[in-house]
């Protein structure tokens, strides 16, 4: 190394880089790796991010129509108007809450296709769950807007709820791999070999 390099102004060196991440500190979306991904964060203290969030509500003329989907088909349940709780004159859209008939129908289909799902390749099941998480992230602005306007949540609470939903997907898909991939070897007091196998048990209604 030359003397001129040693005596160079440290600020001059630093300013040559756009950013200098510490390789020993994982980035926010990598803090749970290699086990799983982390949900995307939002720095609402940052002016650019804050203004972007505020601008979401400058265009709120969308009209949503939401119903349950059972076996790929929208239900025919009765629609009800949904209003902004902060402005009861503002119609946000219509929602068809699942009737007892729709609930029973969904359980029937879940039971019917359970054997097929049970024998579905584990990695393919994990891909489906992670794909759902990715769709939540891809549609974050629309979902955050709905949380605020339809449920009356703050932007911060809406972000937390969305990130929690995404993290649930990533967490349980990683747990599925951990629990279902290999048997859990249980130690026996007399030296025998005991293997605990995790299996899909049944469909459930949430």
Residue spans of the language-model regions?
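Short, hydrophobic secondary-structure boundary micro-motifs
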Residues: 144-146, 181-182
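Terminal low-complexity tails and localization/encapsulation signals of metabolic enzymes
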Residues: 1-105, 112, 119, 123-135, ...
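Secondary-structure edge/capping motif, primarily at the C-terminal ends of alpha-helices
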Residues: 114-117, 150
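Flexible, substrate/cofactor-facing loop regions flanked by secondary structure
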Residues: 116-119, 156
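Flexible, acidic loop-helix segments that line cofactor/substrate-binding pockets
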Residues: 31-33, 145-163
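Extended, amphipathic, non-transmembrane alpha-helical segments
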Residues: 137-143
